[in-house]
Amino acid sequence: MTILKIDEIINPNKQKLTPIKEKQDIIIPDIIDKNIPRRNGSIVVFTGSGGSGKTSTLLNMFKSKKQYRGIFDNIYYFCPLASYLSISNHPFKKLENLYHELTVENLENIYNQLISKKEAYEQYLEKKKEKQRNKNKKKPKEQFVEYLDDEQESETEDEDEITEIQYSCIIIDDFANDLKNNDIEKQLNKMLIKARHLCTMFIFTLQSYLYFPKMLRKQITYAIIFKPKSIAEWNSITDELIHYNKEDSLKLFNYIFDEPYSTFGYDTIENKVYKNFNLLKIENN
């Protein structure tokens, strides 16, 4: 069958789409560098062979005030013990949520913590609305004393109460073999689907893009790729992410990886391509 012509019949009753305002931000607040992943619920992968610079780049981003330093309320860091001990003066050495094993139990516990934090914030908002509704019902003159009491009461908050959105980040550093475990993959998939609603960014580091399970790759929002070991691997990456043919893929490879530690970045939401976090403007025929 060959399509000759397509006609569209307009629905006269069609409603205009109005985006629903959500409580969480689309962009995580206070990140100055606009060329790094900033979207709430980002699923980020850093890939590169051993010694490529991926872990150094990631850790430096959490040390930079223009990037991720001081941005997240909660950081959960998974890193094999040997890899962790190999880094002198590790930036996450004082981190409370530090894990050396990637298990379903650990992931499930974190997932439940994140849900509890979100529910606590929702309860705070509801309580705040309820107080406002009660104030609006009162008559200012007749209930002046009670109104003042309410004002004083509203200023007193529980120390443990979550009164602002908490943004979290889960980093899974160099656990490619564990990601092959079906139960771990399913638990992660469950969490990635909810990443935006949980206000959580996920960051994975792997030695190859293809080590990341295909089910999870479908949810990537930002990829940061260090020089692949072969053109065949690079072609697989560009074919899956940006749908380039082999000729254009090779041109991009030669342009980006012209010096050590260069990176290819791709924002899958906005379809933007980066070299070393510099935006590239690519002209096509």
Regions flagged by a language model, labelled:
Residues 86-96:
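Short, aromatic/basic amphipathic alpha-helical patches
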Residues 95-105:
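Nucleotide-state-sensitive switch-loop elements of NTP-binding domains
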Residues 28-33, 41-65, 69-70, 80-84, ...:
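Conserved P-loop NTPase motor cores
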Residues 75:
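An amphipathic, basic-hydrophobic helix/alpha-beta surface used to engage anionic
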Residues 92, 240, 279-282:
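Short intrinsically disordered coil segments
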Residues 245-284:
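Conserved AAA+ ATPase small/helical "lid" subdomain
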Residues 1-33, 82:
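N-terminal pre-Walker A segment at the start of P-loop NTPase domains
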